[in-house]
Amino acid sequence: MEVALAHPALKAFMCGSLSGTCSTLLFQPLDLVKTRLQTLQNNMHPGAPKVGMITVLFNVIRTEKLLGLWKGVSPSFMRCIPGVGIYFSTFYSLKQHYFQEGSPSAGEAVLLGAGARCVAGVAMLPFTVIKTRFESGRYNYISVAGALKSVCQNEGPKALYSGLTATLLRDAPFSGIYVMFYSQAKKALPQEISSSSIAPLVNFGCGVVAGILASLATQPADVIKTHMQVSPALYPKTSDAMRHVYVKHGLSGFFRGAVPRSLRRTLMAAMAWTVYEQLMARMGLKS
């Protein structure tokens, strides 16, 4: 009863948080493999054979057991559950305020998605930093609270916002591009499909296509963000991380970890949007 009486933006927050919980739990291993691939670059000697996604995956299972693939899931939950909720509630509020009478155009969809992601990204960045460090395997943090305390004591609170520029350069365009492709793909669907029982499956397919395109476009920013958050002392500025990656690995270094990241971001976004839209429909709200 209390849920039914809640403000629509709060309902959007709850639907988003639940969808974020499901997608984070399922796809955390891909995020861990992506982080390990990107941070492995710094330990590789020139001419050393390239390490692929499958090699990293089996190495983690061998040295850290199967559950090692979910290392960093606690900060991921602390970031994604409220973070996805904030994103969808902000998205819903902006859409209702500016586009109540009709659907946004392709350009407006980019701004809508990017704006909502900026709000969520800034709010949850400290947990993004901790999550990245957990996954890198370089830090012996026991808990999220302990990690936050350690960073504040040893590096200062400013370190919790390391990689802010790179994070926003990665997440805002990803969300904007994703929302644009996703909304345009759904618009192109025949009405009989949109209102049929297979609509969730079709929407998921639209989300997968949108996610792949958005992931590839923002991969370089993700590599830079990871370097800055794992080693903030070495790369205090975005330009420092960019220079290091380019000098040591060339242009291909900016696409290290692209496969696991694209898989994870694409599947997470597609699932989150599909679950969110179904939950919102159950509550009688248009997402």
Curated annotation (Swiss-Prot):
It holds the Pfam family Mito_carr. This is Mitochondrial glycine transporter B. Mitochondrial glycine transporter that imports glycine into the mitochondrial matrix. Plays an important role in providing glycine for the first enzymatic step in heme biosynthesis, the condensation of glycine with succinyl-CoA to produce 5-aminolevulinate (ALA) in the mitochondrial matrix. Required during erythropoiesis. May play a role as pro-apoptotic protein that induces caspase-dependent apoptosis. GO terms for molecular function: glycine transmembrane transporter activity. GO terms for cellular component: mitochondrial inner membrane; mitochondrion. Disruption phenotype: Fishes lacking both slc25a38a and slc25a38b display anemia. PROSITE patterns: SOLCAR. Its main location: mitochondrion. Keywords: Membrane, Mitochondrion, Mitochondrion inner membrane, Repeat, Transmembrane, Transmembrane helix, Transport. The keyword Secreted does not apply. It is found in: Mitochondrion inner membrane. It comes from Danio rerio. The chain crosses the membrane at residues 13-38, 72-98, 110-135, 163-186, 202-228, 257-275. It catalyses: glycine(in) = glycine(out). Belongs to the mitochondrial carrier (TC 2.A.29) family. SLC25A38 subfamily. The gene is slc25a38b. Coiled coil: none annotated. Solcar repeats lie at residues 7-97, 104-188, 198-282. At 24 hours post-fertilization, expressed predominantly in posterior blood island, posterior cardinal vein and circulating blood. At 34 hours post-fertilization, becomes restricted to posterior blood island and circulating blood. One of its GO terms (biological process) is erythrocyte differentiation. It comes from the Eukaryota.
